[in-house]
Amino acid sequence: MKADNTIKDKSLDFAIRIVRLYKHISETNNEYILSKQLLKSGTSIGANVREAIGGQSKENFIAKMHIALKEAYETEYWLELLYSTDYLLSLIHISEPTRP
């Protein structure tokens, strides 16, 4: 696998943004249940991408990337729910990238 891996890099950046968002929500709104779900699914994406990269077979790679995709869908759900229940403001739920 190439050293320059866009999916690996973006999933790490996304996980960092999710951790920062979790800290913000839990410190500002004292909300822990929904934001914990967001933290778990949002950081799991990158973990599964890393596992896919180190996979033992093409089938293992595909399976792990599919899990990462499912975690991304779940993360999208938690973000929408937090936004719809006013734990996230419109300006907050569109966060800035962690790297240029």
Label each PLM-derived region with a short phrase:
Residues 21-25, 51, 82-91:
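Short, solvent-exposed, charged loop/turn and helix-capping segments
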